[in-house]
Amino acid sequence: MATFVDTVTLHLRAGNGGNGCVSVRREKFKPLAGPDGGNGGNGGDIVLVADPQVTTLLAYHRGPHRSSRNGGPGMGDHRHGTLGEALELHVPVGTVVKDADGNELADMATPGMRFIAAEAGQGGLGNASLATTKRKAPGFALLGTRGYEGDVVLELKVVADVALVGYPSAGKSSLVAAISAAKPKIADYPFTTLHPNLGVVEVADSRYTVADVPGLIEGASEGKGLGLEFLRHVERCSALLHVLDCATLDPGRDPISDLDIILTELAAYPVPDGQVPLLDRPQLIALNKIDVPEARELAELVRPELEARGYRVFDISTVSHDGLRQLSFALAELVEDARTKAAEEPEAPRIVLRPRAVNEKPFTIRVDGGSYGDIYRVIGTKPERWVQQTDFTNDEAVGYLADRLAKLGVEDGLFKAGAVAGSSVVIGEGDGIVFDWEPTLTSTAELITSPRGADARVDPISRRTNQARREDYFARMDAKAEARAQLVREGEAGLWADEDGTDEDASSDAKA
């Protein structure tokens, strides 16, 4: 079973906003108390938090589906809905957040950093908040909007000061175990280490972390041997330590050729913009396993060539601990120098998300061809949100939506795009709400005489009132009385006769 996971896909669903409430205050001796419907509560966001106590994404590998709570609906007496509780997901420091298309959304490189991965829906307004001087008692409320629902990819990149790189079985895990309190898995076969191991080294007044990166082989920068998975963890390290095996028995291998292959793979690996290339970072070389006589001889043989290339070379043994103290102090010097340079460099500019300008066009209109004629598609944040907030079972709410769209300039835009009465209009991408567009001719002031919950521009679809039923009943009774009177008049005029040809007393029959 996996115990270390550095890449996972999360399926997130943020909480929806609560619906607003339609309510009118009814209290003795206060006939004009007005509307008192409360607003719906906002849903809960899903927030990622960089936590130094978390070292793996294993918990999200086993449970990738996460959702936050919805906002509560509004209630009467001006009571607002409850706020949905935000869901905090703790991730390791160094986690990179990407969308489903691979675009980077956030880099959780600082402990305590927070990022809203899924934004919650907004609560709808109650009719008390929608009341105006012209619409004193709205018979509708706005619905809550839906929260974000989608996938994000979490990719962990280990944050350490020094990365140990080298061929498999070069002794990197043994070195981490020898200079720190870490206890990585150690065995006598290649690729024993399948995930990075971190160790903390304390030397005099210096303290730094080292990362045991799994073994690299030729072609690692192209993905061979899971190389891309391994090289990703080298990106954030400020210094590199090449661990070279001087006791290898593989044909065709020696410390010089191993170093050349590792350098080639490091040079071919693309680092993100703004980061120092891997080969431009401080590097040291450790010739390992000198406790073996043949290995010590080989180390003495290759040392001059490595020093001629400009490297500082250390002969070490993780078994006898020879040279480890000198190596630890040398690594501490590199780390302190890197930290000093990082403190002197100006801080990277902070990305600030600014709201759109007031005069920016709030929507666009696109004409799409359809099988039954042109479809005019309205794309914009406001129109799409307003459609989500509209209760289409309430005629007054539909009329309010029409007023908002007209005030925003959607109708003028449709006219300019060539739309005519009866044209199909869709708001939003995909299968949005389809309208048979009718231009608004009635002003809001003329609509205030409509009963609550109705709009004169929308065909009435509600059932008949008691007054309408009474009027229909009396109309039917009057029609029956008129029919009887007509029969009497026709009988008196002799228009009716029996089968034998004699006249029938229509009036007596009508009375009977």
Swiss-Prot record:
InterPro entries: G_OBG, GTP-bd, GTP-bd_Obg/CgtA, GTP-bd_prot_GTP1/OBG_C_sf, GTP1-OBG_CS, GTP1_OBG_dom, GTP1_OBG_dom_sf, OBG_GTPase. GTP binds at residues 166-173, 191-195, 212-215, 288-291, 317-319. Residues 2-159 form the Obg domain. The keyword Nucleotide-binding applies. It is an enzyme of class 3 (hydrolase). One of its GO terms (biological process) is ribosome biogenesis. One of its GO terms (molecular function) is GTP binding. Keywords: Cytoplasm, GTP-binding, Hydrolase, Magnesium, Metal-binding, Nucleotide-binding. Belongs to the TRAFAC class OBG-HflX-like GTPase superfamily. OBG GTPase family. Monomer. This is GTPase Obg.
